[in-house]
Structures are given as structure tokens and as C-alpha cells.
Amino acid sequence: MEEVDNIIIHTLRQIGCEIPEEIQSLREFTTTVIVQASSKCLHVINEDIDIPSNLPSSMSAKFRVGTMLAAALQDLGYRGEIGYQTFLYSNEKDIRSVFMFLVEHLPKETSLAASEPLGSSVLLNRRVASDLAQRLTLSWTPTFLKKGGVRWKGSKPKTYFREGSASMRRFHACNLKSPQGLTDLTAKISKETKAYYSVIPYVTSQPPCRQDVVPSVLESNSLSVTAVAEWELEWNQSGLSSRLTKEEYLARKRQRLEKKIKDHVLAEMQRVEAGGRAASDLSDIVSSFSDRVSTIESQTQGSRFTRTEKLQFAQDEQKAAAMAGLSESGPPKMDTEEELQKKREQELEALQNKLKDLASSVDEKKSEIKTMNAGLQQTNEQVTATKVQNSEHEESYKVKKRTVDLLPDAENNIAKLQGVVDSSSQRLVNLAQQWETHRTALIDEYRELKVINANKVSETQKKLEEIKSLREKMKEVAEETRGKDDLYKQLVSEYERMSRDVNRSAYTRRILEIVGNIKKQKEEINKILVDTKSVQKEINQLSGKLDRTFTVTDELIFRDAKKDEACRKAYKYLASLHENCKELIQAVEDTGVIMREIRDLEEQIDTESQRNTANNLERITADHKQMKEENATLTKKIKALKSS
């Protein structure tokens, strides 16, 4: 933190803060220096903010100044805990975060506003702007002098670069085929698959154009990465909670998809059949209408063909006469717009009446069809009910017929039936006794299996909760790493945009050291994540192996426990050993939790020790005494004014 403190102190001195030369870190800042520097930074950021830079002697005025500073920082977007105590009774950590926030928001002459978020889009826009500015400073060169758009850049840094878009190609990707599932060396590959993989052309030969190789590879890689990310997200959200293996989860998902496809196909087939029925109904209506027209035509002389031919020729002659403006009566007669409009309205009304008649007839037919369907359904129900009654009557008839057949030799038949009933009752008693003997053993086994299942469910739930917590920690670490990467990019971009006329090698070296520390922390975090994953995987494997071993051993010993006393004792020892192992594992987990809590408490103790609580308490006590004295003087003045 010394480098950060030096950068903050140097920046505060540059904007005009009076900081003594002997102060080398934020730990040495007094309340007066903190208030002065904060007020100066706020005024530089926003000139409308005017807060006193010197603390007054009155305690109420001091509290007012501290509250104004805290409110101004909150208006700027500071999200940490802040109040008047941050400035009057400060600690190193809070003051460092406050000054880092203020320094980031200070305006810079050589860059954009520091409060601008530097995301990937902003960095891209800045890079495009710098590249365009660089291109505008260069002289124009004809295209035929630049082979592939490459030209020499004489200024620093001296290098070749590509100019223009003549040599660029469109991003066109093709579907690539490559061997799958070869990463697992233990898996067996069939001969057919090997033969297929042997004849697959190389990836560089699959696209039709050579320029499409790189886009195709990039597209294939992005698709595979996206598929893996989507599968991990789906497995974390739905797969773990389902308590199924990956193969079972995929099989169930495949069944759901097949069912959806089947339902969709059936719905489409029903829709097409319904459309066909509607089309057939419409064709029936049209045919009936044409039959009516044919009956009307049949009443006139001539065949239908000659009649339609005459009508066509008559219509053509009438149209020609209307176009020529001639009529049989004599001079041409032109229809007015009103007459034409009336004719159109009459024709439209006639067509609407015909349409209404057709619609009413269609509705009547539909209602008749509905009534017929209802009657048909009712008839079918009556038929089924009649069939059921007939079957019942047939059964009763068979029973009565057998009874009548037995009546001639009633005494012998009754004795035989009594013997059958007695044997059946005796067999039922024997079966009940056998069931009781097996029932107790089955109930005991059921209870044991129920207890084992409950233990497994609780252990599985614990493992799932641990996995979820680990995944949340991994996400937090990944977000923290991403934030540090963004900070690294921001620092690098700011360093590249800084003017080179000022000698800032020391601060650049410190920034690079900070970046190196960030990289080391990132590597350590990645190493910890890898170790955590491996340990979790090993724990899962060992727990699964332990459960399977215990289950097999339990079955083998329990099979012989009823016959052998030694096996019974061994079974008891096995159960006690299993319970003791569970208690031991629980004790180890509790010990780990306690150790983690101890580390957290130690960290809290360290943070509390850095807050200078004792010094702040002394200062608060002194301020409290000063407030009492001020209150006493004020009460004396009030009494003197009242007495006068």
C-alpha cells in the first residue's frame, strides 16, 4: 500500500493541497489534512461544491463540515459506509478508499473523464479513435503501391501495418467435421468409427475457399465453448437439484424432447385433417349451389353448354356496346356516377344476402351435425350399457345353471363343497402364518433400508450445499479476477495515453509492480480453484467408494448373520464402525468450520486493530469534554441574558 499512498499524496500535492513533506503515508494524515484534501478534491471535481477546507473550533461546526463532506461524496456515487466520523475519527482503510475514489474522479487534461466506465466497448472505441487519428497523420499512398494493403510506418514505433480494406475478406464460416470423443483414452472406439475418421478430410481442406478456414475454425470453437457453458449452467441449475446422474438426466431430457416433438406432429396432423374437412364442407356447399343453378338452367331451352355459351357471348356483346356507347333504342346513353353507384350497391346487397343465406344454411347443417353426433354418442353409450347388462345376465345364468345341475345329488355335492371350503380356510391360515414369519423380517429390513436411505439423502443434501457454496465462491473469485483484469486494462490504457514529456518512471514502475502482484494473486487464485476442484472430486470419489463398500459388506455379512453368531457380531461391529466413522468425519468437518471461523475472527481482530480505536476513543472523549465546556459557557450566557 505504500505505492498507492505515494501516488495519492503526489496527486493531492499537484492539485494544491498543503501536505507537509514529512508525511509519507495516509496513516500520518491528521484530521485537518484529511478535511482540507477532501474539500480541495471535491472543489476540483465540481466547482459548485464549496465546503470549508479549515475546521472551525466549535464542535457543532466540525460535525456540520464532516456531514457536508460525506453528503458530497455520496452524491458523487461513493458506495462505501461514510459519515462525519470518517473524517473526524478516521482510520487508514476508510481514508484510503475515500481518497482513491476522489483521485479516480479528478479531471485529467490528457484523457477523458476518469469516471467513465472502461469496459470492452469503451476500450474498442478508444482504440479505433487512436487508429483513425494515426491514419489521418499519414500521407495518402496509391493502392497499387501497397501489396496486400501493407505499408511502412516511419514514425515511432517503426513497423509495418495494414491499411485499407482491399485485402480483407468477409467472415464466412462452414460446418466442420472432426473426430469426437478421442480425449478419453480408456474408451473403446469401434472399427466403423475409426474407418469413418480415417477418411475425413483435414479441417483445412473442408471449406470450399481457403479464406474460410480461419472463420470456420473460430465458429466451431465458439460453438463448442458455448455448448459447454450452457451445459454447465443447465447442470448447475437443474441437474444437481434433480439428484440424477448426467446420463440419466440426458436420457430424461431426450425423452421429454421426443414427447414434445410427437405432440407437435400429432397437433399438426389434426390441424391438417381439420383443414381438409373444412375444405370438403366448402366444396359441398359450392357443389350444392351449382346444382341449384343447373336446375334453373335446365328449365330453359338448350343444353347447359349452349346456354353458358350464349350467356358469355351476350355479356361480351353488352360490354362492347357499353364501351362504344351504343344501344338498340338509338343514340348512345351514358350512365351517371350516381346510377353506377346505385347499381354497385344493389349488386353488393344481393351478394351479401346470398352470403347470409349460405352462412345460415351452413349453421343449420352444423347444428344438425352436432345433434346427430350427440345422438350417435348417446346410442353408443346405450349399446355399451346393454352389452354390460347382457354379460352380467350371462354370468348369473351360468351360475344358476351350475346350481341346478348340482341339485339331483345335493348331499354329496354339499359335502364336497364343505370339504373344499375347509381346505381353503386351512390354506388361508397356513398362508397367514407364513406371511407373519416373513413379515417381521421384511419390516426390519424395510426400516433399516429407510434409515440408510435417509442418511444417504441427508449426506447428498450436504454435499449439494457444499458444491453450491463452492460454486458461488468460484463465481465470486472469477468476478474479482475479472474486475482486476479490467483494472489492469484501465491502467495500461491510461499509461499508453499519458504524455511522455513528464518523467513518471517511478510511478510507472509502481503500477507495473501492482499489476505483477495482481497477476500473482490471479495465479494463486486459479491454483486454489484447481486444488479445490481436485479435492472435491477426490472427496466425491472416496465417499462413493465408501458407500459402495459398506453396502456390499453389509449385504455379505447380513446374509450369514442369521446362521452364524460370529457373523452377527461382525455385523454389529461393522454398524458401530460405520457410525464412528461418520462421527469422525463430522468432527473433522466441524474442526474445519471452527478453524475457518478462527481465521475470520483473527482477520476481524487485525482490521479492528488497524482502526486506531484507542486513539479515536481518546479524541472522542476530548471532543465530548469540549462540547460540555461549550454547553456550559452557552448556559452561562443564556442565564446572564435572562438576568439582565
Swiss-Prot record:
The domain of life for this entry's organism is: Eukaryota
What are the entry keywords? Coiled coil
Q: Which residues form a coiled coil?
A: 333-383, 409-486, 592-644
Q: Which residue ranges are recorded for the region named Disordered?
A: 316-341
The reply to whether Coiled coil figures as a keyword in the UniProt entry is: yes
GO terms, biological process: positive regulation of ubiquitin-dependent protein catabolic process
Q: What Pfam families does UniProt report for this protein, alphabetically?
A: CCDC22_CC, CCDC22_N
Q: Which GO terms describe its molecular function?
A: cullin family protein binding
Q: Which family does it belong to?
A: Belongs to the CCDC22 family.
Record-linked PANTHER family:
COILED-COIL DOMAIN-CONTAINING PROTEIN 22, JM1 PROTEIN
Recorded protein name is: Coiled-coil domain-containing protein 22 homolog
